[in-house]
Regions:
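Cell wall/extracellular polymer interaction/catalysis modules
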Residues: 1-107
Length: 107
């Protein structure tokens, strides 16, 4: 399955083998333009992620948790001094096991 997001249109599309399964509107962070760099910047991540959490009935309805940060996001954060080597390794392990990466980092 593939999930595509168009931030400018605020639209999500889910596809399987090229066939559209779902198309629906989405909500984004308070500052959706530009790449996400750190915790609290209000930006929506851009890149390739997997769904690591499905919340059926949250405050705003159903939500999908993305596997942010990715190893690439974490490597940039490590290079910029935002996270330490332990956090970088934790993100890499989470991605290797296809589980939720740590969300409590400075990213």
């Amino acid at each position: 399955m593939e999930v595509l997001i168009w931030k400018a249109r605020r639209m999500l599309e889910s596809r399987q083998e090229g066939r559209v399964l779902l198309r629906c509107p989405i909500a984004l962070g308070r500052e959706p333009v530009g790449p996400k760099e750190r915790e609290g910047d209000g930006r929506t991540p851009e890149g390739t992620y997997y769904i690591c959490l499905i919340k059926e009935a949250g405050k705003y309805g159903k939500s999908l948790g993305l596997s942010y940060p990715s190893p690439e996001d974490a490597a940039r954060g490590f290079a910029a001094g935002r996270i330490d080597e332990g956090a970088l390794d934790a993100v890499r392990r989470a991605w290797a096991n296809r589980v939720r990466p740590p969300w409590g980092t400075a990213l």
